[in-house]
Amino acid sequence: MASTAAAASSQGCISWALRQRGLGGGGARAVPVLPRRRFCVSAAAGAGFDNENREYVIVGGGNAAGYAARTFVEHGMADGRLCIVSKEAYPPYERPALTKGYLFPPDKKPARLPGFHTCVGSGGQRQTAEWYKENGIEVLYEDPVVAFDGKTHTLKTSSGKILKYGSLIISTGCEASRLPAKIGGNLPGVHYIRDVADADSLVSSLGKAKKIVVIGGGYIGMEVAAAACGWNLDTTIIFPEDHIMPRLFTPSLAKKYEELYQQNGVKFIKGALIDKLEAGSDGRVSSAVLEDGSVVEADTVIVGIGARPVIGPFEAVGVNTKVGGIEVDSLFRTSIPGIFAIGDVAAFPLKMYDRMTRVEHVDHARKSAHHCVEALLTSHTKPYDYLPYFYSRVFEYEGSSRKIWWQFYGDNVGETIEVGSFEPKIATFWIDSDSRLKGVFLESGSSEEFSLLPQLAKSQPVVDKAKLKSATSVEDALEIARSSLHSGSSV
């Protein structure tokens, strides 16, 4: 890598001061400002990337990067000073669409870019490539960072470009966990879904498929299987647990959703592990072989068995060995001054429950991006206080007999109380030993009912469990929970 002195000696340099923030705990306190570093942009900046300096660099082009860019623009700090380095071929987009509307059949109005660029998912402006250009934000497409030197503040991309940063935000997200190649994990017709290219490949396969197997009973598996129903395909979901969505759903709740999927023709094979995927004479996947020896025919396989944080060359920044990801404090500062991490890759303190965590969800991606940039650009030192939130919307294609939309807030710990018949509503409440409401789940709620959920989960009020158990409807149960907010027993 060329030296810093080479850039400093170039003619016509433009210098600026970069604020570097100190480290420490996540409490609301004064944050020391470190001595200013002065950087100089090479005179050849317009012609190439030989030691081209940037005041701010975001590595990663996913949801969090798009929302971070918006916050930079809101502060008037993006014009000519911000660069996004991405492995994606497109500007940041709302990734949840890839397992929902993007997979709809062509005759059922599938989602396509530029329709779901950030920040439309939160009601904001659609940030197309033109938006980034108009706001002076440089985006390097399909050119991920492959090398990092924290001492010299230097990044190297896969194409050989060299960037020097003042402040760095790591927003590399996650990658899909894969089946080993030796058991057929890379066969033609085996799909993983994480970006638009993955989704395009899957859509192409769905258009020719007859029998599909979905491996995994979590978010990806359930959303892809629901989309496959729109194509009228023979669909089987295989997973090792006793029921779908085991990290969130209770057995009772899972049973109701499983029955709905079965009504749409989906078959379940529970408590099963994949031994291998076999190829046919054409080399394409033809079946899934289970550990018990049974064989499930399939011409298309979708694997949804989780995701792993993309640390890449940034391991030296500091990895949390318990939850994975790059460890940060409540302002998203890493162990190295001037380096931050946001979104799926960030291991951060979950203030509400006093534990370190990592959240793979678009809501956290959006909020962590905003919080981090606010902390970077202002004197804001309020610790990030995230309320866990998950949701899913499936069977929303035209012609579907029943649309599904549920939301969950809080922590799914403690005793559960389920109310409702799933026609269409159902609610589940998680109550701890002190009768405090810790988490709440609602299917098919109204906008007013959904807006109540975060209030309940955040306040953690003491509820009357006997009344809640005797509620005759979801509406009645929510009103009982709402009344507990005013009892003076909230956290």
Curated annotation (Swiss-Prot):
<feature type="binding site">
    <location>
        <position position="88"/>
    </location>
    <ligand>
        <name>FAD</name>
    </ligand>
</feature>
<feature type="binding site">
    <location>
        <position position="366"/>
    </location>
    <ligand>
        <name>L-ascorbate</name>
    </ligand>
</feature>
<keyword id="KW-0809">Transit peptide</keyword>
<feature type="binding site">
    <location>
        <position position="362"/>
    </location>
    <ligand>
        <name>FAD</name>
    </ligand>
</feature>
<keyword id="KW-0520">NAD</keyword>
<dbReference type="InterPro" id="IPR048618">
    <property type="entry name" value="MDHAR3-like_C"/>
</dbReference>
<keyword id="KW-0934">Plastid</keyword>
<dbReference type="InterPro" id="IPR036188">
    <property type="entry name" value="FAD/NAD-bd_sf"/>
</dbReference>
<dbReference type="Pfam" id="PF21791">
    <property type="entry name" value="MDHAR3-like_C"/>
</dbReference>
<feature type="binding site">
    <location>
        <position position="306"/>
    </location>
    <ligand>
        <name>NAD(+)</name>
    </ligand>
</feature>
<feature type="binding site">
    <location>
        <position position="344"/>
    </location>
    <ligand>
        <name>FAD</name>
    </ligand>
</feature>
<dbReference type="InterPro" id="IPR023753">
    <property type="entry name" value="FAD/NAD-binding_dom"/>
</dbReference>
<dbReference type="GO" id="GO:0009409">
    <property type="term" value="P:response to cold"/>
</dbReference>
<feature type="binding site">
    <location>
        <position position="247"/>
    </location>
    <ligand>
        <name>NADP(+)</name>
    </ligand>
</feature>
<dbReference type="InterPro" id="IPR050446">
    <property type="entry name" value="FAD-oxidoreductase/Apoptosis"/>
</dbReference>
<dbReference type="GO" id="GO:0009507">
    <property type="term" value="C:chloroplast"/>
</dbReference>
<feature type="binding site">
    <location>
        <position position="100"/>
    </location>
    <ligand>
        <name>FAD</name>
    </ligand>
</feature>
<feature type="transit peptide" description="Chloroplast">
    <location>
        <begin position="1"/>
        <end position="42"/>
    </location>
</feature>
<feature type="binding site">
    <location>
        <position position="95"/>
    </location>
    <ligand>
        <name>FAD</name>
    </ligand>
</feature>
<dbReference type="GO" id="GO:0005739">
    <property type="term" value="C:mitochondrion"/>
</dbReference>
<feature type="binding site">
    <location>
        <begin position="194"/>
        <end position="195"/>
    </location>
    <ligand>
        <name>FAD</name>
    </ligand>
</feature>
<comment type="function">
    <text>Catalyzes the conversion of monodehydroascorbate to ascorbate, oxidizing NADH in the process. Ascorbate is a major antioxidant against reactive oxygen species (ROS) and nitric oxide (NO).</text>
</comment>
<feature type="binding site">
    <location>
        <position position="306"/>
    </location>
    <ligand>
        <name>NADP(+)</name>
    </ligand>
</feature>
<feature type="binding site">
    <location>
        <position position="391"/>
    </location>
    <ligand>
        <name>NADP(+)</name>
    </ligand>
</feature>
<keyword id="KW-0560">Oxidoreductase</keyword>
<keyword id="KW-0676">Redox-active center</keyword>
<feature type="binding site">
    <location>
        <position position="391"/>
    </location>
    <ligand>
        <name>NAD(+)</name>
    </ligand>
</feature>
<feature type="binding site">
    <location>
        <position position="391"/>
    </location>
    <ligand>
        <name>FAD</name>
    </ligand>
</feature>
<feature type="binding site">
    <location>
        <position position="393"/>
    </location>
    <ligand>
        <name>L-ascorbate</name>
    </ligand>
</feature>
<dbReference type="InterPro" id="IPR016156">
    <property type="entry name" value="FAD/NAD-linked_Rdtase_dimer_sf"/>
</dbReference>
<feature type="binding site">
    <location>
        <begin position="360"/>
        <end position="361"/>
    </location>
    <ligand>
        <name>NAD(+)</name>
    </ligand>
</feature>
<feature type="binding site">
    <location>
        <begin position="61"/>
        <end position="64"/>
    </location>
    <ligand>
        <name>FAD</name>
    </ligand>
</feature>
<dbReference type="GO" id="GO:0010319">
    <property type="term" value="C:stromule"/>
</dbReference>
<feature type="binding site">
    <location>
        <begin position="219"/>
        <end position="223"/>
    </location>
    <ligand>
        <name>NADP(+)</name>
    </ligand>
</feature>
<feature type="binding site">
    <location>
        <begin position="360"/>
        <end position="361"/>
    </location>
    <ligand>
        <name>NADP(+)</name>
    </ligand>
</feature>
<feature type="binding site">
    <location>
        <begin position="217"/>
        <end position="223"/>
    </location>
    <ligand>
        <name>NAD(+)</name>
    </ligand>
</feature>
<keyword id="KW-0274">FAD</keyword>
<feature type="binding site">
    <location>
        <position position="241"/>
    </location>
    <ligand>
        <name>NAD(+)</name>
    </ligand>
</feature>
<dbReference type="GO" id="GO:0005737">
    <property type="term" value="C:cytoplasm"/>
</dbReference>
<dbReference type="GO" id="GO:0016651">
    <property type="term" value="F:oxidoreductase activity, acting on NAD(P)H"/>
</dbReference>
<dbReference type="Pfam" id="PF07992">
    <property type="entry name" value="Pyr_redox_2"/>
</dbReference>
<protein>
    <recommendedName>
        <fullName>Monodehydroascorbate reductase 5, chlorplastic</fullName>
        <ecNumber>1.6.5.4</ecNumber>
    </recommendedName>
</protein>
